[in-house]
Amino acid sequence: EAGMGLHQPMAWESDAIVTALPETPLCGFYADCVVTLFYDPATQTAGVAHAGWRGMAAGILPKTVEVMAEKLGAKRESLIAVLGPSIRQECFETDADVPEAMERLMGERVHPFIAEKGVKFHVDLQGIGVRLLTDAGLSPENVIDSGICTKCCADEFWSHRATHGHRGV
């Protein structure tokens, strides 16, 4: 649907979009969630995925890799993924439902990415994303984490948690 414009209602709901069309920008709106940009220079295919904790637990990142490889011919060995600014583990305090969802996806392999703090948990969504992408066949050197926390840098990025959900100007 290239050319629809940014503010047109979409005919679908999705946490990821991919393309093999040259010079076609892919856009999305994000707050604290892990936006991940994909590009394969070998096939000139691209994608963008929105990975909130539910999407991460549903496997949106490896599913995006799978669609790019199977439908667009992207090569896992040349595919690059960049995890953009998002809320970091230190600022992402959750109840038990989030780590439980991640454990259902990854089993015990998720434990290094979860810190228990009393009755709350701090979850490293970026670390989980990097692990899922390398498990999906991407080279570790082609998976880049921006390292930027949207909540800590709320003067530069909009953060749902930093603003307590308040939107607008």
Feature locations, PLM:
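Active-site microenvironment for binding and transforming phosphate-containing groups
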Residues: E1-V169
